[in-house]
Amino acid sequence: MKKRILITLLAAISVTSLLPAAVRTVPGASAATAAASIKFANGVYLGAVKNGLPHGKGKLTWSNNKWYMGDFVQGKRSGAGKYYNEYISEDGRTHRTVYNGAWKNDQMSGTGTLTDKVTEPTGEVVSNAITTGEFGSNVWKSGYQVMHAVADPDYSFMYKGNGTTISIWGTNGSLLQQWKEGNLFRVQYQKGQVYKEYWIFPTETAAEEKAKQASIRYLKNIASQAAPHLAKFEQLAKQVPLK
């Protein structure tokens, strides 16, 4: 599911070179950063222009359901801006991808928030995800990700940062208590050379059970370190309802 979000995003935000087909300058605007309307082969730009290219504040619209509004530098999305894309895939599902944050050279780069929501033709929301933190070259680098889906378990959580990665699959609510009790559906924890993992399912061998219990004990002992991240997971989970 997480790979699907990344693939969806990369396909959604890729843009061909901005080669203007026609430029109409707004009367009264300065020549250096004139306000203008520019028609492209695949869309329309309205905003500040310099040397015939979007430069400054503006909005680039490909269709009613696909647009970017924010900063441009020499024809590329750079600075702060919001990207919105809603489309129907071959399976009939509606995908809505929104990124609000920093850009550089037409790519997500810097601090931002990415959301991805998928809805069936019946109106049923089958997945809703939010990813927040630092991005670079259209790739999420660090921060928090929460996904809510029609699945079992229905939530997945991930934190990446400061050399630590925490991944949890389970249900939302009382995450810290579940962490302390060692009864989360699945946990993966890595910090440097330390890696701990356990599933809720029974193990098959005595050695596997021993390793599982060792992981649970270790994770219980670092509950205070995990607590801020678990609280952030629960906070973000409120933003991804299946409705």
Question: Locations of the language-model features?
Answer:
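Sec-dependent N-terminal signal peptides of Gram-positive bacterial secreted proteins and lipoproteins
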Residues: 4-20
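Glycine/tyrosine- and acidic-biased, solvent-exposed loop/turn segments at the edges of beta-strands
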Residues: 21-243
